[in-house]
């Protein structure tokens, strides 16, 4: 759950100032992945001498200020030009060791910084490796699992040189290090023993390579002809390594998604990809695994997507982008017309697998956090239109229990990033058990997109804010379309399906309408600014809305908030109700409306402070038994109502966070892409 970045220029004159700016901006683009500490390493004036390493607790700007201060104190020449240079950078979300400079990356092999490493992931056997290295005379300064990696590289390097013979290559050192590592990782190695060279490798954590050829136009069709693509030549180039594409798009759209077990060697203006043949990237001794032929792909992203534009925060921007993101999600997938004037759904990524899904014994939805809530919101319509039992699994719980998954099951994995560690473990488990695996992600080329048999890209656009907003609503829409596609062979539900398709086509306009509640939700946030807790009651389709709304308030406003199934109110939660506790009840018109009216009456009877979300025109009826604050929203098809109903709660969470003085886009202790267990 960290962000790693690297920049290497070859035969291209770049000032130290420019190199620092590239590294800092790369970290800024990755900061949503972690922001409790950061660090960089750049070349000294002589690349064959110890590099300059800067590490700092706090966010990226704390690192920038620290580096600028050190530059001032040491008279480091920012105008010095480098024809070749290799720099690495890291922004951290702590898993081992508190946020502090000694625990920040790059982690070092020891005095002299022979080897430096930036790491995203978790090394599960680091304690065993640490004990071994201590017995060989190494001392440790940090509390991190990462520190064993550069020290192990130094141990391998020293041992190989002591034994004599041919000089060990950087790749061979990294191969031997990987042979001893267990866990999930994306790593970038730098060493002054191997100037102007970087090594990257990964197993279970995301990593991409970006390539920019400075003397040629940015061609979108360039294909690597062999394992030594962009082979050694004198053409000026820039190479970038990053945890995700957000840090690459401003530099290049030529990218390569690095696969598990692959080692990428950037050297002499060329790129080599090598892959271990043995399971989990293991090989025996200092051997050279097989080369791999790969092709560049084109990054479908624009710089504007990762900027705030006219908004103060990414979360605010992404909430207000939902009419456009929903339109993009549905574009080309809803078909109206034809000889019979029928209305259908076309999901190209699933069309060859729909018959298999329809024959499934059950459909299992697997996700974490917001993605789980989106699947929960869609479960009723999936059961209704498919006639297949639908079960829900939190990914970590399924993995812990090793719950039964069968060959006759369809397992649907929902993840915005496509890299969620717990979801990936559950995916591997489902594949081993023979289930058809379907991926629903927002990231083309992500691990889930590659490992599943088929899937749907939600096309919500880049989501930078840690608290997911537009991805949630797009996930619901995709899963409603999935239900329509699965049930498309059932004549009895045709009118229902066509009504839902009409509702989907109208949905962006309804969301635009509900966004007009922005000022009203800001006023409500002002009333709740000093509260310590908030309960949210929902039922049916909107139980998921209650969970997701409470999660948003919890994540960013740092207020205790709990989403509660209204049918369970009498089984404990009612004991919390008094005249001081604010309670939100979602009571829009659907099959559960009369039951929610009863809930409102019972809460009024206990003098509860109620905020009721209702359909337009229902404010008087929901508050007839007592005073409450009513929020009226447009009414749509019941299975689409969660998309409408979550928007006011997203706005409430946003304004509550701003008014309470917290960081909206970087909530305490959280990161966007949860790539560690």
Swiss-Prot record:
Pathway: Nucleotide-sugar biosynthesis; UDP-N-acetyl-alpha-D-glucosamine biosynthesis; alpha-D-glucosamine 6-phosphate from D-fructose 6-phosphate: step 1/1. Residues 2-269 form the Glutamine amidotransferase type-2 domain. Substrate binds at residues 370-371, 415-417, 420, 571. It catalyses: D-fructose 6-phosphate + L-glutamine = D-glucosamine 6-phosphate + L-glutamate. Its EC number is 2.6.1.16. GO terms for biological process: glutamine metabolic process; pollen wall assembly; protein N-linked glycosylation; response to dithiothreitol; response to endoplasmic reticulum stress; UDP-N-acetylglucosamine biosynthetic process; UDP-N-acetylglucosamine metabolic process. Disruption phenotype: Male gametophytic sterility. Impaired growth and pollen germination associated with reduced glucosamine (GlcN) content, and lower tolerance to tunicamycin (Tm). Mutant plants exhibit also reactive oxygen species (ROS) production, cell death and a decrease in protein N-glycosylation. Abnormal pollen grains due to defects in a polar deposition of pectin and callose in the pollen cell wall. These phenotypes are suppressed by GlcN supplementation. InterPro entries: GATase_2_dom, GFAT, GFAT_N, GlmS/AgaS_SIS, GlmS/FrlB_SIS, Ntn_hydrolases_N, SIS_dom, SIS_dom_sf. It comes from the Eukaryota. Controls the flux of glucose into the hexosamine biosynthetic pathway (HBP) leading to glucosamine (GlcN) content homeostasis. Involved in regulating the availability of precursors for N- and O-linked glycosylation of proteins. Required during pollen maturation and pollen tube formation by triggering polar deposition of pectin and callose in the pollen cell wall. Promotes tolerance to tunicamycin (Tm), an inhibitor of proteins N-glycosylation in endoplasmic reticulum (ER). Homotetramer, may also exist as homodimers. This is Glutamine--fructose-6-phosphate aminotransferase [isomerizing] 1. It comes from Arabidopsis thaliana. The lineage of its organism: Eukaryota, Viridiplantae, Streptophyta, Embryophyta, Tracheophyta.
